[in-house]
Amino acid sequence: MIRGLLLGIIWMIFCVCSSFQQETPFVYNNFGHVDHLHLDGSARIIPSGGILQLTNATNSQIGHVFYEKPIEFKSSESVSFSTYFVCALLPAGDPSGHGMTFFVSHSTDFKGAEATRYFGIFNRNGSTSTRVLAVELDTSLASDVKDISDNHVGIDVNSAESITSANASYFSDKEGKKIDIKLLSGDPIQVWVDYEGTTLNVSLAPLRNKKPSRPLLSSTSINLTDILQGRRMFVGFSGSTGSSMSYQYILGWSFSKSMASLPNIDISKLPKVPHSSTKKKSTSPVLSVLLGLIAFIVLGILVVAYLYRRNLYSEVREEWEKEYGPIRYSYKSLYKATKGFNRSEFLGRGGFGEVYKGTLPRSRELREVAVKRVSHDGEHGMKQFVAEIVSMRSLKHRSLVPLLGYCRRKHELLLVSEYMPNGSLDHYLFNHDRLSLPWWRRLAILRDIASALSYLHTEADQVVIHRDIKAANVMLDAEFNGRLGDFGMSRLYDRGADPSTTAAVGTVGYMAPELTTMGASTGTDVYAFGVFLLEVTCGRRPVEPGLPEAKRFLIKWVSECWKRSSLIDARDPRLTEFSSQEVEKVLKLGLLCANLAPDSRPAMEQVVQYLNGNLALPEFWPNSPGIGVLSPMALSPAPLVIPSLSFSSSSSNNSMFITHSVLYGSGR
């Protein structure tokens, strides 16, 4: 009797535990009576039709639908799954839609995910706390995630940037060719996703067509256990909107752990797509009057909104700006050039502002530009700043990034410069995912920047002190020629005048020791250029706190290598083909320019001759006075002493554009 009672208790425990396990396979022919689904955000079920809606015609929405029970695989089971669903995407305006995804994730928490092209499961940083595999039906074109078109299907792993994608289509076995499908048509589309081993296949077809014999997408390198870091997963759908909107519907859904046991959807039981009928209905007279009244009210609102908007975005033009007319751009032209400062044109964030790519008309062709939006808290100093910007526009040298003009609007200044397609030099020095620049190219860039600095110091109408020379401020044009940019910290003064400024500005590691006492001069630019020479040759930043003390400071480390008669070992280890004599000469020149004593540094005219081989380096040694000695600016907690320092701990400062930092006195 006791034995029977124990067996009964064990059986009851087994039944209770089993009730908490996933129920697979499952099928929903519609969503009229739904169990085991969890909806959040804008997702809802339309009771009248039994249809699942992810988003509607409201901007910046996110909708999720999960099968509420996790799918679990025993250690003896292979991780595989098959799913089949019918969806419909309906435009809600022009432009319309961002599409939707079917996803597999290790959690139902998508905290930090963003709307628009990130589908409510990813974000613009390319990181998410939730590990996820997704199949996207994408109806927008976003260049920052490398979309191939505004009508494609992609496979995403932990990022909105697809590992493989293709334009939406299906293989017709009858016609023996691919036939295009328009995702954002409002017509029902069948989607099959099959995963087994490391292969993921995705197939599409119009409603009532058989599953194609050839998949649209096939990836053979997906390890779902590694992606999810476990054998437990949630499955579901996500959709999102931005300023572009669409209706995203799921009509039916089936899921199984294997293709063989995947249930079919009964197409006859599927709900109809809302708003899909094109049949025109007659309009009653009363309704016509009502619509006319609504139109009149809407028109009045639009007129008021237009007048308000025109006043809100009116430009600031003062009498003293008339002399700068030819280089002043209208706000309207820059707004159109950047597509309304759209995130799709966003290039990055530089000193004190965001930068956007723009396209401006120029005679019979288009000109690509970079437009930086800089905030300015007041009118104090604006006149002087604009005057200096205009003066710098007159600088003409092949190795300078041209400043084209400006626009002023309320408390905002917009600076327009030439667009540099290959970005900033620091990306190629410190981002090891990019191809390393060969030595001959690096040397050519060093000569370009030396020539530009020599021009600023000795050949321009006024002496120009750059004050922020570093790899992040060196841009690369289409031919990878070096161009010196970011004149936001620069100052001009007449020859023979006192060049001292009211505040020490620059980037820690590049700042000469005399900056705090004597102010900026051409000599402080030479010091920074010396550090830049070492930076480019060694492929390292001037100060790297994460390294051992012996290697932490670049100047000191290069000097120590020279003392050990192994100066060539200081070079970037990624350099393969190079002249040892050239590399050692550039390293010695870098130490000479970064001499602690200002009077011992060469002028930029001499530096150009040294680099071009027209002049031999003077004799000096690693133990010579001032050689390899660190500036106190690199050793002390400078930000507490000097109010206007900028730190460059990553290469995100400048990317594919010139970043004009704005500084007036000790303010921003």
From Swiss-Prot:
Phenotype caused by lack of the gene: Increased susceptibility to the oomycetes Phytophthora brassicae and Phytophthora capsici.
Molecular function GO labels: ATP binding; carbohydrate binding; protein serine kinase activity; protein serine/threonine kinase activity
The enzyme's E.C. designation: 2.7.11.1
One GO CC annotation: plasma membrane
Enzyme class: transferase
Cytoplasmic side: 307-668
Gene that encodes the chain: LECRK17
Name by which UniProt lists this protein: L-type lectin-domain containing receptor kinase I.7
Role noted for this protein: Involved in resistance response to the pathogenic oomycetes Phytophthora infestans and Phytophthora capsici.
Keywords, ordered alphabetically: ATP-binding, Cell membrane, Glycoprotein, Kinase, Lectin, Membrane, Nucleotide-binding, Plant defense, Receptor, Serine/threonine-protein kinase, Signal, Transferase, Transmembrane, Transmembrane helix
Organism of provenance: Arabidopsis thaliana
Topological domains, Extracellular: 22-285
Catalytic activity: L-seryl-[protein] + ATP = O-phospho-L-seryl-[protein] + ADP + H(+); L-threonyl-[protein] + ATP = O-phospho-L-threonyl-[protein] + ADP + H(+)
